[in-house]
Structure formats: C-alpha cells, structure tokens
C-alpha cells in the first residue's frame, strides 16, 4: 500500500518535497538528505503526517 508523504526540513521546518512510500516495507518515518532551497544546502528531511 503506497501512501503520499511530505518531507520537512529539520532545521528550517519548511516542507519542501512530496513523495510516496510503501508502508509495508517502511513502517517507520522516512529520513533523507535533501537540498533545502531556503538554506541553500543539503539538510536532513523527515516525513511529516
């Protein structure tokens, strides 16, 4: 079952990316290193509800 999720920057709290994930394979919150346009650098982005 794939669900749509939003990735939020951990340092500036801006929601920058929309993606999807398979809840059966990844039940935990997703964390990825992504580019933050506000800070102009790569930061950790976490899944939000």
UniProtKB/Swiss-Prot annotation:
Any single GO BP term = translation
Q: Which GO terms describe its molecular function?
A: structural constituent of ribosome
* UniProtKB keywords: Ribonucleoprotein, Ribosomal protein
UniProt feature, compositional bias: Basic and acidic residues? 25-49
What cellular-component terms does GO give this entry? cytoplasm; ribonucleoprotein complex; ribosome
| Residue segments, region Disordered | 20-49
**UniProt keyword annotation of Membrane present:** no
InterPro entries, per the entry: Ribosomal_bL33, Ribosomal_bL33_CS, Ribosomal_bL33_sf, Ribosomal_zn-bd
Disulfide links within the chain: none
Q: Which family does it belong to?
A: Belongs to the bacterial ribosomal protein bL33 family.
Spell out the protein name for this chain.
Large ribosomal subunit protein bL33C
């Amino acid at each position: 079952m794939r669900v749509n999720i939003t990735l939020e920057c951990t340092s500036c709290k801006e929601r920058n990316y929309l993606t999807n994930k398979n809840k059966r394979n990844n039940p935990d919150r997703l964390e990825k290193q992504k580019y933050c346009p506000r800070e102009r650098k790569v930061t950790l982005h976490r899944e939000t509800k």
